[in-house]
Amino acid sequence: MTIKAEDLPYRPCAGIMVLNAQGLVWAGRRIKEGNSEYDGSPQLWQMPQGGIDDGERPLTAAIRELYEETGMKTVTLLAEASDWIHYDLPPELIGIGLRGKYRGQAQRWFAFRFEGDESEIQIDPPPTGHSAEFDAWDWKPMESLPELIVPFKRAVYEKVVAEFQHLSGK
């Protein structure tokens, strides 16, 4: 049986851009997973993101996901994107990526300033007992982010960078 993208919903998701005092953005390198949307891609750097639970507000999900994936708690909200940003999985990943249940994601993005000490950042393992999603992290120039993400998410990152560019201090 062939799964059609138009028969699947978008997964509601919160995306999180975290800037340090120098205006650089936190990015983590995804752990390679076989048979997933990251399988075989050399562009594995991304900002934290995660699903919004039923009944959960997007900002609450963003704060929860940020802590679950990175351990960061000492952050200040700077901005919220003006609208939801959608992406579709490429046809070859329909029925595989996002556990096969979604055609892509509808993301609500938030920008935060990291105010803590870098010792707060824990990715492997993260502090909540969840499985690690990243095997490395770094502070990246905001304008470099679209080139670091898997190609099918590049347009999302271009929109996020455009939305929050004024926060980088450049």
From Swiss-Prot:
Sample GO molecular function, one term: bis(5'-adenosyl)-pentaphosphatase activity
Q: Which SUPFAM superfamilies match?
A: Nudix
Listed under GO biological process in this entry are:
nucleoside phosphate metabolic process; ribose phosphate metabolic process
Mind telling me which InterPro entries this protein's record contains?
A: Nudix_hydrolase, NUDIX_hydrolase-like_dom_sf, NUDIX_hydrolase_CS, NUDIX_hydrolase_dom, RppH
Segments crossing the lipid bilayer: none
What Gene3D superfamilies does the record tag this protein with?
Nucleoside Triphosphate Pyrophosphohydrolase
Q: What class of enzyme is it?
A: hydrolase
Q: Which UniProt keywords apply?
A: Hydrolase
Question: What are the Nudix hydrolase domain coordinates in residue numbering?
Answer: 9-162
CDD domains, sorted: NUDIX_Ap4A_hydrolase_plant_like
Needed cofactors, names only, are:
a divalent metal cation
- At the top level, the lineage of the source is Bacteria
Enzyme Commission code(s) on record: 3.6.1.-
Which family does the record assign?
Belongs to the Nudix hydrolase family. RppH subfamily.
How is this protein named in the record? RNA pyrophosphohydrolase
Identify the gene encoding this protein.
Answer: rppH
